[in-house]
Amino acid sequence: MVIKELKNAPTPLPEEDGTYKVFVDNGYAQNKIAYWAEVDGTKQLVNFLLPSRAQMGRVNVDVHGRASGVYTVNGSDYTVGEDVRDPETIRSKQYAHSEINCALVMHTLIAAGFSGLKIRLGTGLPFDHYFRNREVDKAFIKKITESLSSECISASGSEMPIIVSHRVYPESTAAAVAFSLDIDSGDFKTFENGLVVIDMGGGTTDITVINRDFTINID
């Protein structure tokens, strides 16, 4: 279910342990979020997107003069919003563990209704950023998970989501799994000749070859 108006976003549905599973595709052009919610009495996967636009400093205020869309990360202020006039350039590998990414991800989570809630977060990385020398780049991934545990404060007073776990996935590979998985049965489709995924994002294009046994060809 795709949500076009945030005011119509359904309430997130918790797991049995009280946590919430949520995935954020924190791309260069857009932040996409997906989570489980109850819609018309049934459990459905819902998603929506927000522009990845943020500017250093306190830029926007509401009609009452209060800072709007402002987040303080490790002592530095960032304004997040579709209408910021001078957005920061975020098309670099370092964006994934930057303060501005932390502000954008937290803004997206709060917009989805996760303020003050315990979440199990998944985020993505371009395929060639996830691997280094044919191995998972664990040091780089550690920087990302640590960056999203940075001190972040909303000027509006909104409670921050509580990230109890955070896993990072190669984006195009996650897309292959999502395409192949039957949500109702939990089974995977089979592909006689494997599967090729082309992920065209706001700043990167990933091509991933998935073999018949769902191993990844990293050549």
Regions found by a protein language model. Give the residues of each.
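Ser/Thr-glycine-rich phosphate-binding loops at phosphate-binding pockets of nucleotides
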Residues: G201-D206
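Nucleotide/phosphate-binding catalytic cleft detector across ATP-hydrolyzing
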Residues: M1-V197, F214-D219
